[in-house]
């Protein structure tokens, strides 16, 4: 009977050891999920405490943030971009048209033989 009792005790101790190891693993995983602790040294410097450094994970940046935002808001943003492009294009056409008119009027005035139509009685022009 002794060997059977010893076998049962060994099995129980092995099961208890396995359960304790699983509990420790769960606790470590829970600790890893939290934010890393840091000790403030003042002046914006931080020091990670010594010990198990695997616990203190640095948060990874969100690499696909912009892509995600464009996917979620893509269609309204695309419409706004098209409207903005059309509006800006129209404004540019109007400005170019005004500029052409001004340039054309100045060039025509220089070519034409008619005197300027504005009245400046107090001004004079020295002609050679």
UniProtKB/Swiss-Prot annotation:
Keywords: Apoptosis, Cell cycle, Cytoplasm, Metal-binding, Methylation, Nucleus, Zinc
GO MF terms, alphabetically ordered: metal ion binding; molecular function inhibitor activity; signaling receptor binding
Residue numbers bearing the Omega-N-methylarginine modification: 50
Top-level taxon of the source organism: Eukaryota
Signal sequence annotation: none
Binding locations of Zn(2+): 125
InterPro entries xref list: BEX, TF_A-like/BEX
Positions of region (His cluster): 117-121
Coiled coil feature spans: none
GO BP: any one term: apoptotic process
Disordered: annotated span: 1-44, 103-128
Basic and acidic residues composition bias: residue spans: 20-33, 115-128
Main location (coarse class): cytoplasm
Location(s), subcellular: Cytoplasm; Nucleus
Gene Ontology CC terms: cytoplasm; nucleus
Subunit description: Interacts with LMO2, possibly leading to regulate the transcriptional activity of a DNA-binding complex containing LMO2. Interacts with OMP.
Known role: Regulator of mitochondrial apoptosis and G1 cell cycle. Regulates the level of PP2A regulatory subunit B and PP2A phosphatase activity. In absence of reductive stress, acts as a pseudosubstrate for the CRL2(FEM1B) complex: associates with FEM1B via zinc, thereby preventing association between FEM1B and its substrates.
Similarity comment: family membership: Belongs to the BEX family.
Domain notes: The histidine cluster (His cluster) and Cys-125 mediate zinc-binding.
Descriptive protein name: Protein BEX2
Organism: Bos taurus
Gene that specifies this protein: BEX2
């Amino acid at each position: 009977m002794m060997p059977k009792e010893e076998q049962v005790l060994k099995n129980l101790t092995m099961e208890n050891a396995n359960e304790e190891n699983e509990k420790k693993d769960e606790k470590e995983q829970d600790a890893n999920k939290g934010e890393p602790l840091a000790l403030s040294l003042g002046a914006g410097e931080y020091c990670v405490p010594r010990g198990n450094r695997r616990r203190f994970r640095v948060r990874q940046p969100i690499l696909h943030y912009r892509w995600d935002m464009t996917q979620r808001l893509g269609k309204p943003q695309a419409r706004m971009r098209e409207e903005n492009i059309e509006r800006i294009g129209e404004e540019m056409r109007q400005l170019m048209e005004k500029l052409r008119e001004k340039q054309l009027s100045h060039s025509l005035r220089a070519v034409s033989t008619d005197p300027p139509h504005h009245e400046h009685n107090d001004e004079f022009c020295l002609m050679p």
